Amino acid sequence: MGFDINWGSALYQLLAFSVLLFFLSKFALKPLLGIMEKREQMINEQISSAEKNRKDSEAFIAEQRQALEQARMEANEIIQNAKKLSEQQGQDIVKAARNDAERIKESAVAEIQREKEQAVSALREQVAGLSVLIATKVIEKELNEAEQEKLVQEYLKEVGEEL
């Protein structure tokens, strides 16, 4: 059984394979490699874009957290200012109420004092009138001391009943 190689056929197959390889590399392999390079470049760009988007997202999240913290601080400050303002207003209201009460008290005391002075003045006028009346009657009657004392006591008793 011999294993004979047909050298003409082998050479022909080698030549055909070389020509096929040449044409494949010239017309099929270069465009295929170009497509693969473009695909690799596109994938690299997408990876870069995704990485950039991730970094931008992290920066945005950090900014949002900072803005949220700032908003919380401002809200707390507003609440504290509102508390202080309400306390101040409460104190102002109490102070105004005390001032009004003091003013009303002083007005009432002044009114009482005026009425007291009017009562004393009226009493003086009555006493003066009674004194004149007593003096007139004393002169008219020309009483002795005991009768005069009795008459004064009667008039004082009358004055006490009128008051």
Swiss-Prot record:
Q: How does it sit in the membrane?
A: Single-pass membrane protein
Give the record's keywords alphabetically.
Answer: ATP synthesis, Cell membrane, CF(0), Hydrogen ion transport, Ion transport, Membrane, Transmembrane, Transmembrane helix, Transport
Instruction: Write one Gene Ontology MF term.
Output: proton-transporting ATP synthase activity, rotational mechanism
Query: Where found?
Result: Cell membrane
GO CC: one term? Answer: proton-transporting ATP synthase complex
InterPro entries reported for this sequence? ATP_synth_B-like_membr_sf, ATP_synth_b/b'su_bac/chlpt, ATP_synth_F0_bsu_bac, ATP_synthase_B_chain
Q: Which Pfam families does the UniProt entry name for this protein?
A: ATP-synt_B
TM stretches of this protein:
10-29
Q: How does it assemble?
A: F-type ATPases have 2 components, F(1) - the catalytic core - and F(0) - the membrane proton channel. F(1) has five subunits: alpha(3), beta(3), gamma(1), delta(1), epsilon(1). F(0) has three main subunits: a(1), b(2) and c(10-14). The alpha and beta chains form an alternating ring which encloses part of the gamma chain. F(1) is attached to F(0) by a central stalk formed by the gamma and epsilon chains, while a peripheral stalk is formed by the delta and b chains.
Q: Which family does it belong to?
A: Belongs to the ATPase B chain family.
Q: What does this protein do?
A: F(1)F(0) ATP synthase produces ATP from ADP in the presence of a proton or sodium gradient. F-type ATPases consist of two structural domains, F(1) containing the extramembraneous catalytic core and F(0) containing the membrane proton channel, linked together by a central stalk and a peripheral stalk. During catalysis, ATP synthesis in the catalytic domain of F(1) is coupled via a rotary mechanism of the central stalk subunits to proton translocation.
Listed name of the protein: ATP synthase subunit b
